[in-house]
Amino acid sequence: MLTRTLLSALLSLMATTSLMAQLTIKDLTDGKYRPESENVEAMADGESFSRLEEGKRIVRCSFKDGKTLETLFDADNVRGRVKIKEVCDYIISPKEDNILIETEHQQIYRRSGKGKWYIYSIKNKTLAPLSDGDAQEQPLWSPDGYMVAFVRDGDLFLVKLLFNNSESQITKDGELNKVINGKPDWVYEEEFIFTRAFCFNADATMLCWMRFDESEVPAYSFPLYKGLETERKEFLTYPGTFEYKYPMAGERNSIVTVHSFDIKSRVTRKLSLPVETDGYVPRIMPTSYPEKIVCLTQNRHQDQLSVYVCNPRSTECRLVLTDDVKPYVSETAYEDFRIVSDGFIYKSERSGTAQLYHCSINGGAPRALTSGEWPVVEFYGYNAKEGNIYYSAKDGSPLREAVFVCDSKGKVKKLSQREGVNEAVFSTNCRYFLNKWSNIDTPPVFTLCDGSNGKVLTTLEDNSELRNRLSSIRLGSKEFFTFTTTEGVTLNGWMVKPADFNAGRKYPVVMFQYSGPGAQQVVDSWSAGNMGGCLYEEYLAEEGFICVCVDGRGTGGRGAEFEKQTYQHLGYLEARDQVETALWLARQPYVDSKRIGIWGWSYGGYCTLMSMSEGRPVFAAGVAVAPVTSYRYYDTIYTERFMRTPNENPDGYADNAISRATRLSGRLLICQGTADDNVHYRNVAEYAEALIQADKDFYQIDFTNRNHSISGGNTRAFLFRQITNWFKQM
């Protein structure tokens, strides 16, 4: 009887398991398991936010309960003859009476794009084109809401609403691959992470902008083919060429100057901003004072950030702060730089961990607003009257982040309620915030919360549909772990095991990593893994693999000392740590030590190649997607931040994937887009030649007309099928 009962239970379990859904690569790449998101913009009243619904409606909602208060724009209810079908982006005017609405968006580079923009009157429900000319880039309302400035073809334009939307051209020297006004060049956009390089002053009497003279920057070009998705019929017979300015390590950068335009007198001036030879201007921004804008500068070594207060009318610039941080200033310093009513707030690692500081607009010693062993991740808001500052920081572990408020006396209160990774968008008065929470097992949950105590007021989105979809799949277990290398370094990792894991079996392992400076893959967040939720890793687990990710030396979340020890030798320590991970895994009783593979994308591809040629032959196979192979071929700003120039650091540059080609061990697959504007095809071309001359076998797949993301049409599904099959052949 007992035997019959056990047999019945076993058959029932087998039947249930066989009925459960399976993950497929096509479903993963087509977005079947992509979580819903909430993108909101806080409105001026401090009580409401706006958001875009279904790509055609802009609504105003309450921060208290999330309910819709009014519809600001509906594409189906526009009056007049001008109509649009979709909303790609929108910008509400300062007085919240008009909206700039974008349609027909066209991507330019990773962060930039252009489109057809319209001015929408909320009161009249009418649309009017922002310009009758070609597509516009980066439109910006003036503080009084009566003007809009934008960029087109490298020049700045100004539209005045009070003069029947009259358009005037502010600059006239913009020229492809020579001069850009009001928007960054390629390397500034990519590495300083911004797309608009102009601003109005506080009373809207002056327009200020950055001018990029890239005429002496070396050009780079690559071929464009007809292709299929999207088809370029103009290249049916002969391929075309895309050429742009790309400064590689040690080469010339654009000469950047800052200018002002007096809107009434139409006088243009050049600001007397001191910039070191070949130095940088990562940001300009307005203050609440009409006679003051702020300009940030950096030296070429990027170990000094200077803050200047500039008068756009007199052109005088006064130094108010210099932040010296060795060996380099992290890019988050200017990402989180914020002008507030009584000065500015910035993030610095001067104490060894990233913390927030306040400085008067008139200068003086900066005052620390936060402190502690765990780094601040992001700055959200500041209440000057109460002295409260709102931010996220690591929460007792590099893996987790929480939202905090710190008062004027330094007392810190955690606002977020759940352990994992929390991010926030605060109302303009910081009374409320939208909290995005997830952990490695749970898709994002978006809640509206009280800004004083973090109490959840309502849930906007909990991704219940996705959770239900995933509940029908037999997923493997995900677990965090730490281990210590033979060099005495403790590293963090996560591991995904098959759902039917048997400790008595030996499993092949696929290691995924990125490993770049300041980056993190090992986080208690749904963002973990290559496709979020470790879902691609779960798919591999279904196929019988254990999947592992370890953050080695140089990665983020553990303070400046841990992060910056790879300085001047990118790839050396990172590769050692990935090899150490493989050696540790090989000692585990459930791992097949002869079948350990590694892969990564971009920097992760570089680290894959460096690890497979580190000298200890531990990897049976590897896949490098869009890899850098020598940092001589990568851009100035990123590379020199971590490596200085090739002339200053010849030994650091000399140790690269190409020079290590003779030591390659394991079966290698390289995947590369032919139209990658970021990591150029040249990287794999030069590496392939080195492998051929070293008589090393390898396989390579080129993706026609694909950029660094290698996507479009069936491309992603094909790519991940090749990666999967490659590891199946270990």
Locations of regions flagged by a protein language model:
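Serine-hydrolase catalytic core recognition
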Residues: P290, E423-M730
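Predominantly five- to eight-bladed beta-propeller fold
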Residues: L69, E104-Y109, G113-K116, I170-F198, ...
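Non-catalytic accessory segments flanking enzyme active sites
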Residues: E36-E41, E47-S48, L52-R60, E70-T71, ...
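Beta-strand C-termini and the immediately following turn/loop, strongest in propeller blades
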Residues: S50-K56, S62, I92-K95, I99-R111, ...
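Short loop/turn segments that connect beta-strands within beta-propeller blades
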Residues: F63-G66, S121-K125, L161-N164, D262-R266, ...
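Signature of short aromatic-glycine-proline-rich micro-motifs recurring in repeat-based ectodomains
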Residues: E36-V40, I84-I91, K183-A202, R283-I284, ...
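Asp-box/WD-like beta-propeller blade repeats and closely related beta-sheet repeat scaffolds
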Residues: R111-F157, F163-A197
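Blade-loop segments of beta-propeller domains
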Residues: K67-I99, E104-Q106, D132-E137, D324-P327
